[in-house]
Amino acid sequence: MSNSINPIVWQEDCVLLVDQTLLPLAYKVVEIKTYQAMAEAIRTMIVRGAPAIGVSAAYGLYLGAKEIQTTDRTIFLEKLEAIAATLRQTRPTAVNLFWAIDRVMATVQGATGNIPELQNLILNTAKAIHNEDLATCQAIGDQGLAVLPETPEKLTILTHCNAGGLATAGYGTALGVIRSAWRENRLGMVYADETRPRLQGSKLTTWECVQEGIPVTQICDNMAAHCMQQGRIDAVVVGADRITANGDAANKIGTYSLAIVAKAHNVPFFVAAPLSTVDFSLSDGKQIPIEERDPKEVYQIGDTRICPEGVQFYNPAFDVTPAHLITAIITEKGAVAPDQLIHLKG
């Protein structure tokens, strides 16, 4: 299957990003020419999804590096680290952000050459991360086919948030598995949770499915249990923003509830993510930093306030699904039980 969704494109001296805050009502591509603009694009979720954030941050490092005016290597690296620090501060939960920045920084720090050569090395490393992520997502999709239920012949798969081409370099993780199932004629229907409060399932996942003719049914988040009780769902496949060494997985808020419901109804629950999303330095999910976002996301829809003044709000962007609720974690190297994840390290 060709990759028809390209949320990130490198074009000579800038990065082109699909503005995901406008979908599905408008399709707009924005030019990102500075690292400050890239940091803002990540923070405001013009670009979102852990792998896509990582790719974007790598390009952001280059956008900053090419503006550094010095011939002194030490000064160059100091200024580059300051740029990296700005990018690291944008979103705390998605580990791919830190993984990509650390990879670029380690590559540059270990290299020789003059400043233009180091700048070019940063760009080439960012391009490599970009290309590798697309190949990785396609591999995740194919690995997922091996663990999906054998019956029925055509599956109904429920997914949460958006772990598709828009959240990666293309193709997607959870939606990558779904795309591969569609390609192999194993998919009957996708059920997409709307995913409050930002509605990425409603706005983004359904949009991706429509673009490729994949049958999709949107439901409200609180309808998932009913759908499972009625036997409508054969499997749940979600993405992840950070997975710990023991297999706990942080994903968009509401994923944990979905996993509990799936367990109660004996519906297999899969997490699809690249190995770069696994943070082996953390032993369990209690150590994952959980981003809290603007309460406006909860009390407003568009520009319309939907609750009275005087109410307090709590808006965590992610929750952590314990490993014991996860049937398997699907990576580019294979699908394994959460407690076997350590065997894929390295």
Curated annotation (Swiss-Prot):
Site feature Transition state stabilizer, where: C161
Pathway: Amino-acid biosynthesis; L-methionine biosynthesis via salvage pathway; L-methionine from S-methyl-5-thio-alpha-D-ribose 1-phosphate: step 1/6
Active-site residues (renumbered): D241 (proton donor)
Keyword terms of this UniProt record: Amino-acid biosynthesis, Isomerase, Methionine biosynthesis
Major enzyme class: isomerase
InterPro entries linked to this entry: IF-2B-related, IF-M1Pi, IF_2B-like_C, Initiation_fac_2B_a/b/d, M1Pi_N, NagB/RpiA_transferase-like
Annotated substrate binding sites: R48, G49, A50, R91, Q200, N251, K252
Domain of life the protein comes from: Bacteria
Gene Ontology biological process terms from the UniProt entry: L-methionine salvage from methylthioadenosine
EC number per UniProt: 5.3.1.23
Catalysed transformations (reactions): 5-(methylsulfanyl)-alpha-D-ribose 1-phosphate = 5-(methylsulfanyl)-D-ribulose 1-phosphate
A molecular function (GO) term: S-methyl-5-thioribose-1-phosphate isomerase activity
Signal sequence annotation: none
Function: Catalyzes the interconversion of methylthioribose-1-phosphate (MTR-1-P) into methylthioribulose-1-phosphate (MTRu-1-P).
PANTHER family: METHYLTHIORIBOSE-1-PHOSPHATE ISOMERASE (PTHR43475:SF1)
Sequence similarity: Belongs to the eIF-2B alpha/beta/delta subunits family. MtnA subfamily.
Descriptive protein name: Methylthioribose-1-phosphate isomerase
